[in-house]
């Protein structure tokens, strides 16, 4: 059986390793090397590193859909499966039609919820209690293909996007192996997505990171968790941009304008919101490292009564 793998970041690495160990992988497609670090030296993707360690041929098309010679090489491989995990490119129909059993994508949400580029972040931002991975047969739409298998994961009250990323990353490979075996054994019936249940998870940017203090403390807490470790929720203290890395929710009302700092102690900075109180536990000012409030107030002052914007 021939498997071609397409993926790029850390998230795709455990999936690639699982496929190598279980079935073997014929070829790997990944994004071109990019400048990294302060020296801007070209660095290879995490997926490329693993492929080279296992002596697997690597292809790095700038845009696969615009490279007919590369597509022809892919056709000549006659793959049974093309497995796609965070590749970072849209596959044209010409590629989707190549493998015997189709192109299978691992998507980090319980489809049809949270189609798009940042599903695990938006699952937390929107306050979901359960998410997971879905394997699906790819079509020309954006995460619209028929679903194959799902693996559910609980989102705990203080789980961050970084923590959820690592859980889904590690569990993705096992789900892909089960999916491939299920297809080969005729044990899986593809299921169409219910369009009425869809919602989208657009790419993250710094615009959505600005905290709206008129929201409830729970909604802000979800935003903080969903944007940790990147791009990190932001607010302004005396026109200074402050990153908010960790928070908790306290029940109760302050009757103060949303954003008003109502108390400061070593356990955190208590801030009035549209509903309940948000306690900032870890923060970061410009040109400084992130600190717990207990550390921060040793050398800095946060004034009660100031309004965060």
Curated annotation (Swiss-Prot):
PROSITE patterns: GART. Keywords: Protein biosynthesis, Transferase. InterPro entries: Fmt (IPR005794), Formyl_trans_C (IPR005793), Formyl_trans_C_sf (IPR037022), Formyl_transf_N (IPR002376), Formyl_transf_N_sf (IPR036477), Formyl_transferase-like_C_sf (IPR011034), GART_AS (IPR001555), Met-tRNA-FMT_C (IPR044135). (6S)-5,6,7,8-tetrahydrofolate binds at residues 109-112. One of its GO terms (cellular component) is cytosol. It holds the Pfam family Formyl_trans_N. The keyword Magnesium does not apply. GO terms for molecular function: methionyl-tRNA formyltransferase activity. Its EC number is 2.1.2.9. It catalyses: L-methionyl-tRNA(fMet) + (6R)-10-formyltetrahydrofolate = N-formyl-L-methionyl-tRNA(fMet) + (6S)-5,6,7,8-tetrahydrofolate + H(+). It is an enzyme of class 2 (transferase). Belongs to the Fmt family. Attaches a formyl group to the free amino group of methionyl-tRNA(fMet). The formyl group appears to play a dual role in the initiator identity of N-formylmethionyl-tRNA by promoting its recognition by IF2 and preventing the misappropriation of this tRNA by the elongation apparatus. HAMAP family: Formyl_trans (MF_00182). PANTHER family: METHIONYL-TRNA FORMYLTRANSFERASE (PTHR11138), METHIONYL-TRNA FORMYLTRANSFERASE, MITOCHONDRIAL (PTHR11138:SF5). This is Methionyl-tRNA formyltransferase. The lineage of its organism: Bacteria, Bacillati, Bacillota, Clostridia, Eubacteriales. The gene is fmt.
């Amino acid at each position: 059986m021939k498997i071609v793998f397409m993926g790029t970041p850390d998230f795709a690495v455990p999936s690639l390793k699982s496929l190598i160990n279980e079935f073997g992988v014929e070829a790997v497609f990944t994004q071109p090397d990019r400048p990294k670090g302060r020296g801007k030296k070209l660095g290879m993707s995490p997926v490329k590193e693993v492929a080279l360690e296992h002596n697997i041929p690597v292809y790095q098309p700038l845009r696969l859909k615009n490279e007919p010679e590369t597509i022809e090489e892919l056709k000549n491989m006659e793959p049974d499966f093309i497995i796609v995990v965070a590749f970072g490119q849209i596959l044209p129909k010409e590629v989707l039609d190549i493998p015997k059993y189709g192109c299978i994508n691992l998507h980090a949400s319980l489809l049809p919820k949270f189609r798009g580029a940042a599903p695990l972040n938006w699952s937390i931002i929107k306050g979901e209690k359960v998410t997971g991975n879905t394997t699906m047969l790819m079509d020309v739409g954006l995460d619209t293909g028929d679903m194959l298998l799902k693996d559910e994961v609980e989102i705990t009250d203080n789980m961050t996007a970084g923590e959820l990323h690592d859980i889904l990353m590690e569990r993705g490979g096992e789900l892909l192996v089960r999916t491939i075996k299920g297809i080969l054994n005729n044990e899986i019936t593809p299921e169409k997505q219910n369009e009425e249940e869809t919602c989208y998870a657009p790419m993250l940017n710094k615009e959505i990171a600005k905290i709206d203090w008129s929201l409830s403390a729970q909604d802000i807490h979800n935003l903080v968790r969903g944007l940790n470790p990147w791009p990190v929720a932001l607010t302004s203290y005396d026109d200074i941009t402050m990153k908010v890395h960790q928070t908790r929710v306290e029940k109760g009302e302050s009757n103060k304008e949303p954003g008003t700092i109502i108390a400061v102690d070593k356990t955190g900075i208590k801030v009035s919101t549209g509903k309940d109180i948000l306690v900032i536990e870890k923060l970061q000012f410009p040109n400084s490292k992130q600190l717990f409030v207990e550390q921060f107030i040793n050398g800095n002052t946060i004034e009660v009564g100031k309004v965060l914007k």
